[in-house]
Amino acid sequence: MEPQLLGLLCTRNPAGADAIGKFILIGDHKQLPAVVLQSSEQSEVCDEALQAIGLYNLKDSLFERLYRNLSRESANRQTSTSHPSSLIPHPSYDMLCRQGRMNIEVALFPNRAFYGGLLEPVGLPHQQGELTLAPELCDCEFAGLLTRRVAFLPSAVEPPAQSAKMNHSEARIVARLAAAIYRQYAAVSGFNPAVTLGVITPYRSQIALIKKEIAALGIAPLEDILVDTVERFQGSERDVIIYSFCVNRAYQLKFLANMTEENGTRIDRKLNVALTRARRQMFMTGVPQLLKLNPIYAELLSVVCHS
């Protein structure tokens, strides 16, 4: 990737001087990187000269490498001097802390777990205030959840004889919940399949199963909502997100995660993307006893179930 940027980074004007005076890179290295087919072992960099400039793995982006180098320089400055100015971050990077997507409660866990509590809401209308239940849904099985910002619905594990990449219990929960969300938003503010609701799940088999359950409802607008993987959802948003974890075996937890570490904090980039797609409400369904085997998921369930 980096050699392809050379033409842009080294652009000269007719006088032979730099044609571009400053480059500003904006991104989030705590979310999913580009998809690389090679394993980390296959793309590992062993050349000492490349390691000296901070290039340890060919999977790392230029953005991430520059950020890592500047973070290291900043840490070295702070440990090499006791002058108060050493507490000032490196002048070449900073963090954008204000976010206008998520409601405060939706942002609570990812903000605390992945961003050190530094994210602040812009203060848009959807980021605050209470939700009101549509009167016709008072007898709905999800009446107690439809006005919550974040909720977890436990599912049953798939029998051993079935594929681990499908969970019928979760598919049925997702479909029934989607129907309730459709009725709620259609009555209160209007339902737009491309804006209101999206479903995230890790496997194509589960995607197909969820779509089948939704189609059986006979609610035409729901058949147009996006049901896809977290990788395909990155960069997009919906008012409401339903996340079907589809973990039926403990070994699947490794596939479900995309781990990195910063300042001693373990960050699951895949979970971070999934939890930050929702503007107004975030619903999750999964097998709790399996999810709790992962410390980050255990903390997530603890926060959600006690909020």
Each model region followed by its residue ranges:
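Conserved helicase motor core of SF1/SF2 NTP-dependent helicases
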Residues: M1-S307
